[in-house]
Design a protein with these regions (language model features):
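Ribosome large-subunit tunnel/peptidyl-transferase-proximal elements
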Residues: 1-231
């Protein structure tokens, strides 16, 4: 796997001046003042994170994918949609974890309005009222559509760049949701339960990490199906 990681540029870290102290043991060295990540450790971290995700999937538990940086948005969205799990790939809505009951009520409201709209039940209202409902649906969908199938807090959150997603990591810690994260050399690993230290700003490196998480989740789902057959 080291060759694959090397091929996608996973070993490239940030400049020496940007390297976080918590990353010291994961950096092989510096070349032209740029951190070179120790990929042997990255392999072990990937295996540990994959085993964790696989176990959750086998137990039928749901994960949440988060990647709001430009390089990660499409990758995260496509991966989540392929697994039919919730995701955030534009902007984290503060309180999604720590104020979950309120967020859940807004998701329920979105479903209620869309259901009434689809059944034509909103047509009994005035045009002005219908316009207000339409605007409310659009506003709710903007932030909550990708979370529409989330009925409770996830069993884990998979994050791209825990420095950029510091609020997500902080909220997860407060509600005891384990964090799996692809973390570059500038990241603080505090609050990250399953760190995978590698290039978190390169599309190919991000894709590799996300693919491994998807692969692990699907393997866990397959394990669950096989267990049912043999039970």
């Amino acid at each position: 796997m080291i060759k694959e990681l090397f091929a996608v540029g996973a070993h490239f870290g940030y400049s020496k001046s940007r390297s976080h102290p918590s990353m010291r043991s994961f950096i092989y060295g510096f070349k032209n003042q740029q951190a070179v990540i120790d990929l042997e450790q990255t392999v072990g971290q990937l295996e540990r994170a994959s085993a964790f995700i696989r176990g959750l999937a086998m137990e039928g538990k749901e994960i949440l994918l988060v990647g709001n940086k430009i390089e990660a948005m499409n990758i995260v969205r496509q991966a989540a949609e392929s697994l039919d799990v919730p995701y955030v790939a534009s902007r984290w809505l503060g309180g999604t974890f720590t104020n979950w009951p309120q967020i859940k009520s807004r998701i329920d409201r979105m479903h209620e309005l869309k259901d009434k709209r689809d059944k034509g039940e909103l047509s009994v209202y005035t045009k002005k009222e219908q316009l207000l409902f339409s605007r409310e649906i659009s506003r709710l969908e903007r932030y909550l559509l990708s979370l529409s199938n989330m009925t409770k807090l996830p069993a884990a959150v998979v994050v791209i760049d825990p420095m950029q997603e510091a609020i997500v990591v902080s909220e997860a810690g407060k509600v005891k949701v384990p964090v799996v994260a692809l973390a570059g050399s500038d990241c603080n690993l505090a609050g990250v339960n399953y760190p995978v230290v590698a290039n978190d700003s390169n599309v190919k490196s991000i894709q590799f990490f996300v693919d491994k998480m998807v692969e692990a989740y699907r393997a866990g789902q397959s394990d669950a199906r096989e267990a049912k057959v043999t039970a």
